[in-house]
Structures are given as C-alpha cells and as structure tokens.
C-alpha cells in the first residue's frame, strides 16, 4: 500500500483565512497537536513577511521533534535568507524551504510582468540558491492548473535540475475539475525529466468545493504528497481539509489503496483545538468534524442506526475521537429512538407510561426544533408525578477582575435539599465549575467546551455546549443565557444531572443517594 505524505499548512495558508490569525504561542500549541496527529510536514509560516511570522517559524522548529518544519519563501534572496535564519538550528533532515513563483499567463502578465524566459531564470537562480542552505527544497508553480502544460513541464524540469527535492502543483484558485487535475498530474509524471526522483505534491483550494476530490484524483495519478489544512481553513473558500482527505482514504480503502501516518482518533480533538484558538466554528454539516455528522433525527434513520449503525453511518464516531451520542430528538423521531434515549439514562417505563410520555414528547417536538434532555426529564417527571430533573442553579455570584483572583459561589437545589460552595479558579468559568464540583463532591473532567452566540445585537444569548467525563463515561450538557458564566454553569450542571440520573443516584424526594 503506497504511503502518502501529509503536508499540513494550517499554520501558514490556513492562517490566511480571514479571522484565523494566531499568536506565536498559539501556533506552537497547534504545531504540537499536529505532531501528535501524525502529519509529516508542518508549514509554520512565511518568515520574511513579519517579525511575528519569523518568530513563529523559529519557535515551532524548536518545539516539535518528528515532523519536517517548512518555511515559505518567494523566489527572492531575502525571503530565502529569512527562512534559513528561522530554521538554521533545526537538523537538516527536519527542515525544508518552500519556494514559489507564479507561472500562469494571467499572473505573468498582470502580477509579475515577466516573460516565460524570466520565470525560468528565476526558478533556476533561486532554487539553486536555496539548495545552498537546505537539503530539502520544495518548489511550487503558483496557479499551475491554469498554466500552459508545455511551459509547466519546462518549469518543473528546471526546478528539479536546480536541486528541488519536491515539486508542488497548486490549484491556487480552485479552478480545476478532478478529471483534468488527475490528467495534469499524470502528464507531469510522464513528461517531466527526473520527476521519479522527487516527491510530487499537490495543493488544492476549495473555491468550487473540489479540493478533496482533486487531491484524491492527484494521488490516483501518482502524487506522493498532499497539502492540507485542518477544518479546511484557508484563503477564500479554504484548502483541502485534512480530515476529509484522510478519512476518504480510510473509509474507501477498497478503491483507494493508500495510507497516511495520521492517527485518526486525534482528528476531532485537533479540530476542536483549532476552533478554540481561531474562533472559527466548522459548519454543522461540515464533513467529519461538523456537529451534525453523527446525529440522526429522522425516525427511520434512528431506527436503522439503533438496529445496526452501518445502516446510516460509514464510520464510527470513535474513529475520529468523538463521543458516540448520535440521536437528536425532534419532530421526526419515533418511539424506538425515544425509548432508547430514556433507557440510556436508566429510565425504564412500562408500555402504558411510555405511551403517555411519547404523546407529550410529540406535542413538544411539534413546537421546538430540538427536544433536549432536560425537556425529556420534565416530561417524565410530569407523567410519573415525581422529580427527575436533578440539581438546578438557584443562585451564583462571581467576583473577578484583572487584578483579582476569580472566585465563584453557588447555591444548588434538588427537591428540598440545597448545597452551597465557593471556590477560586483560572477565570470565572473555571471558578464556577470548581464550586459546583465542591458542592456535589464530584470530580468530572472537562473534555469539550464550545460557546457560540444565539441571535444578534444586545439581546444575543450565549449557548454553551460541553462534555464531561465522569467515571470513565461521557455526558453532554447545554446552557443558554445572556450571561456566559451562567450559561456555562447551567450546561455543567445539566451534564452532571445526566450522570446522576443514569446511575440512579437521585433520591425521589431530592438529594443524592
């Protein structure tokens, strides 16, 4: 099985996505995650462009051990010098320079104002210059997919003769179709002298939504390296998404006999870290990492998944490091899904009682987009005429400031029982979580925390979704409020209540067993 190198450019091309800029420290944190994920190369930045970019490349090169660290440079002497200065302390076999120049007619005429001969001379001069400092040199012909093929062959021949160890074929504006891009790669593979001695890389943009398809077509026609970003972030519509490309190979290995070094179980944690750093939340229906990917609301789909997951799922959530909660209850849900959801919390009802619960559930589902677990607990409590909601937040107080140690106090109540506690923390949200832990005598581990706005303007609310690990199992919670700390506390208590209910730890008259 042929191995495909994964060249990750999240920290360089991905960061060029509007709103995705990262500090030096954030780039280092992300680079360490990418190393754990198993990427082969990390393009850390464009050293000549600013002191911050230079420092980021240098710091990433110092932080990671296994991957090759790459610095970008134009075919300009000062760019190459800056890349060398940023990477010179890294072992020669673990550092690479990526030099590029545009080659398409529109770029030659309007951007560079150069003739073909001038382009070839620059390639020859600056790839040769780069090889004085780097054993590993990648050369890219920017806008390759819109460049005349005979000229493109000549450009890559010149780059290889001048010492390039990787040639990269960018579909810079996402213009190519899979069949023509695959044909281009095959033509280059057959027509460029010496290409068999170097890596053949592709860098596809997603302007027509074809970045992953084009990358797969390239691999099928001889490419040995694919350039990607996490969550597909990047210029304009983004780049080939690491998670989509890798999982396509994994899921369809019957037709795609290629492997990568990616630890797929770390894909979702890596995606969440990037979201946390940049604030860019993937669309709910984003393949692989979107919130809806493993969720089913249709009753027919839910029934099928409950009987056998592969009826409607081509991969397991655990394959990418996600929890296995898959049922979203709404107006399309049926009895099977509702009963399964209740049983997951230890709530077993006889047929007559369940029918009453189901009728109230369908009434509520017709009025709401989604029925949450708290809604279910309220319905069951109403039908059974006994409390099932667990703890609620009666009162909280947070004391914080830029010169103060954040402190939170909470009052929680279930039935007739109240519990109070106060704690300090690393910020107001952390403080209130610790106060809740202290009040309930629990030590959950926060696995995931997502916050997003609901609505706009001064009346916008914050929605917090989080996941806790308690006794080795995962429990999700949701909270909404105009106050982010309150929304966080509600979500935290919501997740804990699910644990208490599932384990049968809530007494009917209130309190914990």
UniProtKB/Swiss-Prot annotation:
EC number: 2.3.3.13
Region (Regulatory domain): 392-513
Cofactors demanded by this protein: Mn(2+)
Annotated Pyruvate carboxyltransferase domain residues: 4-268
GO terms (BP aspect): L-leucine biosynthetic process
Entry function: Catalyzes the condensation of the acetyl group of acetyl-CoA with 3-methyl-2-oxobutanoate (2-ketoisovalerate) to form 3-carboxy-3-hydroxy-4-methylpentanoate (2-isopropylmalate).
UniProt KW keywords: Amino-acid biosynthesis, Branched-chain amino acid biosynthesis, Cytoplasm, Leucine biosynthesis, Manganese, Metal-binding, Transferase
Reaction(s) catalysed (UniProt annotation): 3-methyl-2-oxobutanoate + acetyl-CoA + H2O = (2S)-2-isopropylmalate + CoA + H(+)
Lineage: Bacteria, Thermotogati, Thermotogota, Thermotogae, Thermotogales
GO molecular function terms listed in the Swiss-Prot or TrEMBL record: 2-isopropylmalate synthase activity; acetyl-CoA C-acetyltransferase activity; manganese ion binding
Pathway: Amino-acid biosynthesis; L-leucine biosynthesis; L-leucine from 3-methyl-2-oxobutanoate: step 1/4
Subcellular location: Cytoplasm
Keyword Plastid: no
Any Pfam family hit: HCS_D2
Name listed for the protein in its UniProt record: 2-isopropylmalate synthase
């Amino acid at each position: 099985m042929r191995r495909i190198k994964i060249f990750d450019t999240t920290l360089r091309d991905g960061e060029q996505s509007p709103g995705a800029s990262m500090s030096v420290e954030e780039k280092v944190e992300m680079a360490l995650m990418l190393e754990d994920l198993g990427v082969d190369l990390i393009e850390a930045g464009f050293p000549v462009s600013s002191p911050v970019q230079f420092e980021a490349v240098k710091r990433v090169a110092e932080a990671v051990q296994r991957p090759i660290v790459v610095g970008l440079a134009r075919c300009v002497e000062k760019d190459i010098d800056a890349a060398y200065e940023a990477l010179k302390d890294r072992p020669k076999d673990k550092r690479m320079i990526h030099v590029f120049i545009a080659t398409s007619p529109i770029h030659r005429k309007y951007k560079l104002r150069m003739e073909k001969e001038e382009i070839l001379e620059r390639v020859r001069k600056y790839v040769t210059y780069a090889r004085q400092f780097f054993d590993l040199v990648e050369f890219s012909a920017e806008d390759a997919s819109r460049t005349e093929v005979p000229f493109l062959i000549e450009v890559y021949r010149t780059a290889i003769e001048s010492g390039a160890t990787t040639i990269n074929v960018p579909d810079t504006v996402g213009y190519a179709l899979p069949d023509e891009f695959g044909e281009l790669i095959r033509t280059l593979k057959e027509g460029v002298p010496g290409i068999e001695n170097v890596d053949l890389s592709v860098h596809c943009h997603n302007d027509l939504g074809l970045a992953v398809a084009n990358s797969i077509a390239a691999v099928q026609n001889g490419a040995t390296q694919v350039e990607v970003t996490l969550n597909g972030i990047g210029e304009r519509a983004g780049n080939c998404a690491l998670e989509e490309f890798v999982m396509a190979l994994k899921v369809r290995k019957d037709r795609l006999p290629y492997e990568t070094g990616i630890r797929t179980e770390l894909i979702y944690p890596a995606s969440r870290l990037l979201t946390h750093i940049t604030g860019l939340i993937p669309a709910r229906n984003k393949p692989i990492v979107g919130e809806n990917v493993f969720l089913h609301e249709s009753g027919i789909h839910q029934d099928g998944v409950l009987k056998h997951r592969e009826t409607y799922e081509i991969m397991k959530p655990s394959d990418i490091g996600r929890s296995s909660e898959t049922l979203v209850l709404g107006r399309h849900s049926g009895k099977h899904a509702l009963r399964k959801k209740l049983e997951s919390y230890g709530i077993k009802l006889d047929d007559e009682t369940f029918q009453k619960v189901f009728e109230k559930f369908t009434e509520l589902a017709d009025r709401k987009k989604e029925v949450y677990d708290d809604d279910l607990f309220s319905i069951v409590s109403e039908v059974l005429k006994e409390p099932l909601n667990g703890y609620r937040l009666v009162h909280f107080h947070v004391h914080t400031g830029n010169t103060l140690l954040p402190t939170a106090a909470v009052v929680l109540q279930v039935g007739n029982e109240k519990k109070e506690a106060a704690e300090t923390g690393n910020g107001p949200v952390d403080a209130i979580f610790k106060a809740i832990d202290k009040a309930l005598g629990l030590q959950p581990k926060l696995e995931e925390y997502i916050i997003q706005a609901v609505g706009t303007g001064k009346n916008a609310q914050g929605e917090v979704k989080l996941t806790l690990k308690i006794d080795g199992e995962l429990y999700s919670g949701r909270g909404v409020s105009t106050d982010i700390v309150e929304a966080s506390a509600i979500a935290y208590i919501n997740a804990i209540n699910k644990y208490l209910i599932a384990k049968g730890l809530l007494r009917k008259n209130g309190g914990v067993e």
